[in-house]
UniProtKB/Swiss-Prot annotation:
The active site is at 322 (proton acceptor). NADP(+) 1 binds at residues 93-100, 127, 230. GO terms for molecular function: glucose-6-phosphate dehydrogenase activity; NADP binding. D-glucose 6-phosphate binds at residues 230, 260-264, 298, 317, 418, 423, 459. HAMAP family: G6PD. It comes from Spinacia oleracea (Spinach). One of its GO terms (cellular component) is chloroplast stroma. The gene is G6PD. It holds the Pfam family G6PD_C. The lineage of its organism: Eukaryota, Viridiplantae, Streptophyta, Embryophyta, Tracheophyta. Regulated by metabolites. Post-translationally inactivated by cysteine-mediated redox modification via the ferredoxin-thioredoxin system in the light and this avoids futile cycles with photosynthetic CO2 fixation. Pathway: Carbohydrate degradation; pentose phosphate pathway; D-ribulose 5-phosphate from D-glucose 6-phosphate (oxidative stage): step 1/3. This is Glucose-6-phosphate 1-dehydrogenase, chloroplastic.
Amino acid sequence: MEELVSCHHLPLLCLQSSVPPNGCLTFFQDSACQRCSHSEFSNGHPLNDVSLQNDVAVNPIVAKSIDPSADLQLLPLLESVKEEPTLSIIVVGASGDLAKKKIFPALFALFYENCLPENFTVFGFSRTEMNDEELRTMISKTLTCRIDQRENCGEKMDHFLQRCFYHSGQYNSEDDFSGLDCKLKEKEAGRLQNRLFYLSIPPNIFVDVVRCVSHRASSASGWTRVIVEKPFGRDSDSSRELTRSFKQYLSEDQIFRIDHYLGKELVENLSVLRFSNLVFEPLWSRNYIRNVQLIFSEDFGTEGRGGYFDNYGIIRDIMQNHLLQILALFAMETPVSLDAEDIRNEKVKVLRSMKPLKLQDVVVGQYKGHSKGNKSYSGYTDDPTVPNNSVTPTFAAAALFIDNARWDGVPFLMKAGKALHTKRAEIRVQFRHVPGNLYKKTFGTDLDKATNELVLRVQPDEAIYLKINNKVPGLGMRLDRTDLNLCYSTRYRGEIPDAYERLLLDAIEGERRLFIRSDKLDAAWSLFTPLLKELEEKKVAPELYPYGSRGPVGAHYLAAKHNVRWGDLSGEDS
């Protein structure tokens, strides 16, 4: 329900029964009051409980004939109309790791910062048998007042937990979702219902849950939105089929496909850095940028998740979504506005300007066992949940190109891997050499020192730094490369919000800028599907690399093929 218009602070009353076709009747003292649309407020549902309170007549009423004293009889009803809508957040898959480690803590952080509406409840739904108190005990183990150390932290935590409830059921049972709906209505108490469902479940049961939500648990008077976690299919065909199935039950604006990397602080800051600083925007093209590197590395392997990971691999898990979405944000043209659709339109244009990846532009690897000191690290296929003959890549590097006037000829290099020497995620922009550089003899043949580089470190230790050439103090002429460094932990006090906090708040507010639209998803899959099919059909053997190393040697040859050196492998960044 939209907010009711008022005249002299007297709210409108919209009665559905026997209402003239041109809209709802308005109680007014001023002829300037406007009518409200009948469909806007009723949402097509029968007369609601609020309208039936206090024996209010439902026959046509002529506004001008109302006795002013009748206003007193309507005050309880008018007060109920003014109540804030309820917000019900339903975490489907509440007993899973993602819900416990990320979703519930993010919701508590939003509550802690007073970002949730007054009338909110959180419901957990899963197959696990549990009651409300058991859910609260489970949630409480992962909640922390990490933002700061206010004295009322414990009190806030207790208040949040009292808003948390649980309903057990099967994901494909409409009856179980009807039971959930009854519990939701009990908490909503006849007020306007807004419902947000977070699907923290395996993708093979997405459609069952969406069907049950649509048929039995959607809001009768407000909005219903569904957040969907990746993976969104395995290739173009399965992704399109998933989207088609969703749209049998939901409209596109109800579907919030989440990629939590787009909620990272440094990724969010990327467009601000570019479009609000004159020093960068003129340089953002092939004229000044030599290459762009998007790097994701983890210093641990699959460790127990091998069975799940083996079905997808590093390309589907990281490159096709996280890194490609960041690339689109980095390379897009200036949008008309900051409106969600304007930004998403520009990102889709970037993806459609790219050619599908070919096998010769990709290197795949898989980590093997390695001993370091007195400690031994198991290889990928040593995991008991992984087939011994698996060729699923745990590392991939790729070179992509954008065929448009801004980026023609600029290689965009992606690299993602597990069990590497460090954990990091960053965007590295290497600029071209200075034409006719007066100091080139001082640099010698060291390519690194001759190149300016802008680095956005997404994690850990968020930072933005620009590598520049500088004279070392002294009598001689010796040049050194140094950093102009913005380290977030030094410059800004307080902890940076988690990506899930930002994205959950955006979904609640209906802000879609950081969520993935269906056409963008389709464009992303079209780039990687031919490559994935070729890898699987030919059973391409990945290059082995030791656990804890810098990855397969082939990645260096791929970069050298495009006259690039990986920026994260220089001595100063190791």
